[in-house]
């Protein structure tokens, strides 16, 4: 059975390059999702695995890293030591496990894979007085530079309604994964579901981004349970990742939905 380390390798191995678009809250307090505030033309993640249990993560053109670059080793023995990483087939990332009391930010990285494309959305909240306020969203349409044929770019939709329209009447499956340290965790067995656009449409903040990415999230984190919704419209399917927090604002589970589009 494929463990979390193997899912990580199967999902992320490659030389990923793309254009980073960042939407950052301005000094007037507004987060405008119509136009990025910062664009990094060549964000590049080279993720390699020389052996079955070790690898290297090497990134350049990074918006958040000091000097725009970072490098660190990868190892099965240390992977996911905190339980903050999650992997499904063709989707993976990492999350803050609770709304922190002292840390400077609350963040999530979500990646959706399709062939040799990787669509990444980053969500960041920062303290604003006694509240946590959405501070930045980053979107990157990565393509693997090792692929013989580069996956074509996807047009950005004009609205969330336009992006979600092809899903009307679709059915799919849902899997759940609960936080746990190490590599042994397994997602639940897939269960059938029907498409419901309301978690996106009813969110306080919703937007569409490059590569078919979409989100529906709160502007300010609630004092009790809440959900973060992120999705990606890919050729022939839509993937949705729900990040579910309980009333103590601790991460309860990740839910991955997949819908086939005729």
For each predicted feature, which ranges?
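Soluble ligand-binding/transfer domains with enclosed cavities or grooves
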Residues: 2-13, 17-262
């Amino acid at each position: 059975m494929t463990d979390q380390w193997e899912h990580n390798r199967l999902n992320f191995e490659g030389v990923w390059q793309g254009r980073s678009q960042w939407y950052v809250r301005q000094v007037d307090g507004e987060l405008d999702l119509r136009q990025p505030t910062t664009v990094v033309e060549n964000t590049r993640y080279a993720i390699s695995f020389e052996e079955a249990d070790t690898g290297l993560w090497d990134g350049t053109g990074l918006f958040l890293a000091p000097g725009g670059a970072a490098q660190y080793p990868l190892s099965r023995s240390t992977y996911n030591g905190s339980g903050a990483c999650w992997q499904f087939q063709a989707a993976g990332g990492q999350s803050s496990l609770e709304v922190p009391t002292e840390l400077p930010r609350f963040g999530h990285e979500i990646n959706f894979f399709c062939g040799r494309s990787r669509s990444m959305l980053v969500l960041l909240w920062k303290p604003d007085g006694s509240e946590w306020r959405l501070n930045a969203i980053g979107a990157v349409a990565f393509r693997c530079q090792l692929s013989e044929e580069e996956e074509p770019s996807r047009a950005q939709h004009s609205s969330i309604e336009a992006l979600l329209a092809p899903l009307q009447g679709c059915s799919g499956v849902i899997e759940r994964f609960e936080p746990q340290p190490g590599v042994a965790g397994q997602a639940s067995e897939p269960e059938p579901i029907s498409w419901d656009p309301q978690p996106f449409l009813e969110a306080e903040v919703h937007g569409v981004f490059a590569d078919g990415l979409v989100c529906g999230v709160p502007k300010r984190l609630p004092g009790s349970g809440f959900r973060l919704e992120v999705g990606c419209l890919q050729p022939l399917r839509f993937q949705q990742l729900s990040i579910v927090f309980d009333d103590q604002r601790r991460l309860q589970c990740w839910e991955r939905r997949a819908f086939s589009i005729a």
